[in-house]
A protein has these predicted regions:
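Phosphate-binding site of ATP-dependent enzymes
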Residues: 1-73
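A general marker of short, structured functional hotspots
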Residues: 6, 17, 52, 78, ...
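C-terminal active-site "lid" helix and adjoining low-complexity regulatory extension at the edge
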Residues: 56-57, 71-75, 84-127
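Hydrophobic residue at the +6 position relative to the catalytic HRD Asp in the kinase catalytic loop
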Residues: 80-82
């Protein structure tokens, strides 16, 4: 889940298969429909994982928790990753970043370019 101005901007859901785990879901190579993503911000030789990603809006209570985490940490732009344990349904926030790693090819995955929103925020802050 990514935030700008401590407010929820967008989320992505990574569809894992088996026992795989990916610490950088922004670099996933395909949408859930199988469409290849433009990955200009990723290393040229990055291996393709075969994992699939889609835009996702979590439940309101998770959005509020993520916004609260970022506000309490004093992080205006960044990301929070979480996972729900299939064994017991518990929610775990496992990665809080003060630097956002926006999803590759935002328009295809989430329907807009998150960098545009980031630039708008930074211009407003600089004014």
């Amino acid at each position: 889940m990514e935030v700008v101005g401590t407010k929820f901007l967008y989320g992505i859901k990574v569809h894992l298969s088996g026992d795989t785990f990916d610490l950088c879901p922004a670099d996933i190579c395909k949408t859930t429909g199988g469409q290849e993503l433009q990955r200009s911000a990723c290393p040229v030789d990055a291996p393709k994982s075969g994992l699939k990603v889609e835009g996702y809006t979590p439940p309101d209570e998770i959005i509020h928790a993520i916004e609260r985490i970022m506000q309490e940490a004093g992080i205006e732009v960044g990301g929070v990753e979480y996972i729900i344990d299939d064994r017991d349904g518990r929610l775990y926030y496992y990665d809080i970043n003060a630097l956002s790693n926006f999803v590759a090819d935002g328009p295809k995955v989430i329907g807009f370019n998150p960098f545009t929103r980031l630039v708008d925020f930074l211009e407003k802050e600089a004014a």
